[in-house]
Structures are given as C-alpha cells and as structure tokens.
Curated annotation (Swiss-Prot):
UniProt protein name: Actin-related protein 4
Entry-linked CDD domains: ASKHA_NBD_Arp4_ACTL6-like (cd13395)
Task performed by this protein: Chromatin interaction component of the NuA4 histone acetyltransferase complex which is involved in transcriptional activation of selected genes principally by acetylation of nucleosomal histone H4 and H2A. The NuA4 complex is also involved in DNA repair. Is required for NuA4 complex integrity. Component of the SWR1 complex which mediates the ATP-dependent exchange of histone H2A for the H2A variant HZT1 leading to transcriptional regulation of selected genes by chromatin remodeling. Component of the INO80 complex which remodels chromatin by shifting nucleosomes and is involved in DNA repair.
Gene name of the encoded protein: ARP4
Subunit structure and binding partners: Component of the NuA4 histone acetyltransferase complex, of the INO80 chromatin remodeling complex, and of the SWR1 chromatin remodeling complex.
Localization of this protein: Nucleus
Length: 492
C-alpha cells in the first residue's frame, strides 16, 4: 500500500486546487476548494427521452447512439416525450448511470477539469450503508481520472465551516431532517437521527391543503400560460393557454407543479411561537385567534394570475415541522408516504464509531450516563413520531454527559428549510424549556446563500487546509488495497 506521506509531495502544494462535490436531494454543488461559493449549483434531476422520443431520435441520427440526458436548468424546458427523473433520494444516489453522466458533463464540458492535477472531496450523509459507500468509491476511482479523493461527512464539513469542532448539526433539508453530534470534528454516527419530515413533507402538505381548500382552482403550470389577468379568489382566473405542440409527459408536468408548492413554502410559511396541537384548549383557541387576524393574511399568486388569500394555514403548515402529527392529509396517497418515524437510524457500518477520550475514561471507571427518558420503547403509534425539537432533545440525551453541555452550546441550524421565518426562535424557546439544565445556543448563518450551501462551503474550507494533504487517498492506494479496506482504514 502506498503511504499517505507520498501523497503529500504530490497533492500538498499550494498550486493544487481540489474539487469539492456536494450532492443532495434537491441540488448538486460543484466548485473549487478555497472558494466562498460553488461554481455550479444544479438540480439533482435530469430529463431524458422516453421510448417514443428515443425511436424518433435514432432515426434522425441513423442509429448512432449518443447520451440524450439533459442536466441543469434546461430540464425545465418543455420537450416532447421527455421524462424528468431524480438522481438522488435522501441525499443518496439512486441512478448511478445518470449521476456519472451528470458529473462528467460538469467536470468535462463546463469546468474543463484537468483530472491529473486535481483531487476531489466528496461529501456524504451519515446514513450511507457500507455497500453504498463502496459503490461510491469504486464509481469515482473507476470512471474518473482524479489522482486522489476523500469522503467527508456533511455534518463534519458544516462544523468546519462554522469553526466549531464540538457541535450538534441540525440539517433541515429537502427530503429529510437530520441531527448529528460532531465531536473533535468527527460525526458520531450512532447518536445521529433522521426523519423524513423535511421540505418535501411540507410541499406535499401544501399541495394537499391547497387542492382541498380550493378544489375549484386550476393549478396550471407556468410553462402552459401564454397570458394572464390578475384576479383574487373567489373571482375566476383569467388566462390563456399556450399552444403546445409538444407531447408533455406526466413526470415533467409533476416536476413543474412541485415548483408551485416550493414557491409557496418559501414565500408564505411562517412558524408560530407555540404549537397549535395542545391539550390546553384555551391556549390552542387563543393561538388560532391570534394567527387568524387580518394582519397575518397573505396573498399567493398562482401561475394563472389568480391570487389565493391564506392566513392561519400559513402557520399550521410550518408548525408540522415541530409537530408532524398535527397535520392530517386529505389525500391518502400522500399520507402513506410518511409513516410514523422516531428518527432512529439502523446503521450497519462495518467500522466502530468514534469514541472521545472522555468517554473511554468514563467506561473504565464503570460510570455510565443514565438512559434518556424517551429512549424506552414507544407505547403508542403517536409516541413514535418525533418532531424537530423532540428529535434534537433525544439526540442530546444520548450524548456523553461530559460532552453534552458543550454540544448544546453549539447547535448549528442549517438547510434550506431552516430559512422559514421564526423557525430558529421557536426552536430556541422549545429547546430551552425541554432542557433546563443545559445552556442552549443556536448558530444559524444569516446569509441565506451561505446556509443553503453550508456543507459545500465547509468542504471547501476542509480541503484547502494546509494540513489536509495527508488525508487524500490516491488511486494507486485504491488499486493496491481495494475499496473495502480503504473504507475501514481511511474513511472511518
């Protein structure tokens, strides 16, 4: 096996500019280590022709085959017989062929990389299986000419971006909400938790609520609208439809309609000070009365030009991040997408989790931290559901008691959904009440672009450190040792 010391002479110089790749469910980010922001932010989806379009395309090309996948914002252009498909789900690649083509497109055609001179740092979520990590490693070593690479856990990157080696990373993303303790810059996998009550969960609630409350309204996609006249519901919408000769697929239409729910989420939702679903009836009624006042009314304009007035619903939907069981789906198909989740991960990693020195000394003295009060087996279906505050509180209770106060003082809130107004204020209030013995402190970057790209920025910081050159794992080392051995010895 080649030593890491040999890698230093090759990759340790200042002239080396590593590539940082951060792929998540909603967007993929690519750029250079040391930069403040990624060069490329692209959807983690692609468009491709279906069988009818492929047959017609092959006739035009006289049977010559060429990749027909479309990446970037171009997937939003209507095309006949083209489907839109995701590349990742839960920040994990589900379409390897499309992922490889997407990376090649941006590495070769957009950035025109010189592979021989640039190693790559790849971020990964903490819930990746050993089989997935091995496939990821083999894919990059076998399909690209990078001389070396490094796999970095996303929470670790975020901790570096904030300069907080001991912290709790709360990532409220598109497909999931995850809570991960980071100690000495290393993510503690066994203490991590994840639920699916994230951005897509809100999107589905928004779709369910709007289509049920405004059943007669036409939620037409923007690309179909030729002209429109502004109206306010219940006045009928006034618009003309564009004459489209293209045979638009259902997947493209569904993808475009998600943009409506996404825009609603970003512009209309606001977190209430307290949860609505409470046993205190007078408090619940008082809250509903407050958030039903005219000052809380907002108009949301649809692509058709028709505006919908909403008030209390804006707060009730956002409240479901903290209390997922508070929203009852009208559409059973949407409801089945979100079974009750307590956030506990069944990780089957083949390597031991990181153990801080304090934890080792404590074990030697036969002392133990009392189990968390909510760590017992749930007694009912509802007790299995953990909202945002409950998820964080439970994670804190599983951390070594000597480290708990340090972690509670450094809670990093990140992810695009965390930008919903008043979310951090509500979270601080509930965490302080739930953990009276801890001094809670939240750290949420004010710049929305920075918070949205925080994992990538952390990877950029990490890969540009002067001491990081010894961490790169060369392709030669991979060829000599194999993916499984490298994962166990170098990427623990």
């Amino acid at each position: 096996m080649s030593s890491s010391g040999n890698n230093a002479s090759v990759y340790g110089g200042d002239e080396i500019n590593a590539i940082v790749l951060d792929s998540s469910s909603f967007h993929t980010r690519i750029g250079y280590a040391g930069d403040d922001f990624p060069k490329i932010i692209t959807p983690s989806s692609y468009a491709s022709p279906n069988e009818d379009a492929m047959e017609l395309d092959n006739k035009k090309k006289n049977g010559k085959s060429k990749s027909s996948k479309i990446f970037g914002e171009s997937i939003n252009i209507p095309r006949s017989n083209h489907n839109v498909s995701p590349i990742l789900k839960d920040s994990v690649i589900i379409d390897w062929e499309a992922a490889i083509e997407q990376y090649h497109y941006y590495f070769d055609d957009v950035l025109t990389l010189n592979y021989k001179e640039q190693p790559i740092l790849i971020t990964e979520p903490v819930w990746c299986t050993p089989q997935y990590r091995q496939t990821l490693l083999e894919t990059f070593y076998e399909n690209f000419d990078f001389p070396a690479l490094f796999l970095a856990k996303s929470p670790t990157c975020i901790s570096f971006q904030q300069g907080r080696p001991n912290c709790l990373v709360v990532d409220i993303g598109h497909d999931s909400v995850s809570v991960t303790p980071v100690i000495d810059g290393i993510s503690l996998l066994k203490n991590s938790m994840k639920t699916n009550y994230g951005g897509q969960y809100l999107n589905d609630q928004i779709e369910d609520m709007l289509t049920h409350k405004f059943s007669g309204v036409n939620f037409e996609n923007r690309y179909r609208i030729k002209s429109k006249t502004p109206t306010v519901y219940p006045e009928e919408s006034k618009y003309t439809v564009r004459d489209l000769s293209e045979n638009i697929t259902q997947s493209f239409d569904d993808y475009q309609r998600q943009n409506i729910w996404h825009e609603f989420k970003e512009t209309m939702l606001e977190v209430p000070e307290k949860k609505f679903n409470t046993s205190n009836t007078s408090q619940a009624n008082s809250l509903k009365e407050i958030y039903s006042q005219d000052s809380n009314k907002r108009l949301f304009e649809l692509p058709t030009g028709q505006s919908l007035e909403l008030c209390l619903e804006r707060f009730q939907l956002a409240d479901s991040l903290f209390d997922p069981q508070s929203y009852k789906f009208n559409n059973p198909d949407l409801a089945t997408k979100y079974p009750p989740s307590n956030g506990e991960l069944s990780l089957t990693n083949s390597y031991d989790d990181y153990k801080p020195l304090k934890r080792a000394r404590k074990a030697e003295s036969n002392q133990s931290t009392p189990p968390p009060s909510d760590a017992k087996k749930p007694s009912s279906k509802t007790s299995q559901i953990r909202g945002l505050t409950h998820l964080i509180t439970h994670t804190l209770s599983t951390i070594d008691i000597d480290l708990r106060s340090s972690v509670a003082h450094n809670i990093i809130v990140t992810g695009g959904v965390s930008l919903i107004p008043q979310l951090t204020e509500r979270l601080y209030s509930e965490l302080s009440n739930s953990n009276p013995g801890l001094k809670i402190r939240l750290h949420a970057v004010g710049n929305s672009s920075e918070r949205f790209n925080q994992a990538w920025i952390g990877g950029s910081v990490l890969a540009s450190l002067g001491t990081f050159h010894q961490m790169w794992v060369s392709k030669q080392e991979y060829e000599e040792a194999g993916a499984e051995r490298i994962l166990n010895q170098r990427f623990r």
